[in-house]
């Protein structure tokens, strides 16, 4: 997973207008339109057959990525609704193998000057994509998924909705072995106690170990998140048929 760095809005917005010029598409203008959620620009360019809904656009951290992933990364809800309605590929991937729902589950709005963080737009993006049928599990081998990203970022609303929609609490783990960090491990390494609790209540197995690596508890202790130790140790102690709620709460 790569946490992507922002580039200036001015670079994105340059040359962007709701009434697009005719002729070949300007990639920077397209990226700028998505960044400011200008659905009119995007729709007009699609209807003019200058682009398709599955074309790429420049976005935060990429020279080019599928439009739906750029849209999800920006939390551009109007453009996202349009792309979904226009049958864009919901499971298209960035060069880092991230899908739109994964990016929507990871990021948030941050206003550092006001010390304000909001997940509202991104929570809605997760809902839109999940309700439209986006694949919640990563079909590529040894790759992260949306639930893991939500756990890593402490995105509780997104995490709970993904679980409600059927996301697997243990990811792709089998026989208590995983070849990529499980959602519980992702929460543990970041010290996200509430996310860890939600996952344990949903049946996440605290005894899963990364192949030749660590368990969720070991990740937590390695990163000095001792406030997770009690719940993860209790999770490890569950006997067959026991639930986290019945034994640990």
Positions of the model-derived regions?
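Sec-dependent signal peptide recognition
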Residues: 1-7
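C-terminal motif of bacterial Sec signal peptides marking the signal peptidase cleavage site
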Residues: 14-15
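Bacterial lipoprotein signal-peptidase II cleavage site
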Residues: 18-22
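Ankyrin-repeat boundary/"N-cap" motif
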Residues: 23-32, 55-68, 93-106, 139-145, ...
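Ankyrin repeat A-helix N-terminal signature
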Residues: 32-37, 70-76, 103-122, 149-155, ...
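Terminal, low-structured helical/coil segments at or just beyond the last alpha-helical repeat
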Residues: 219-249
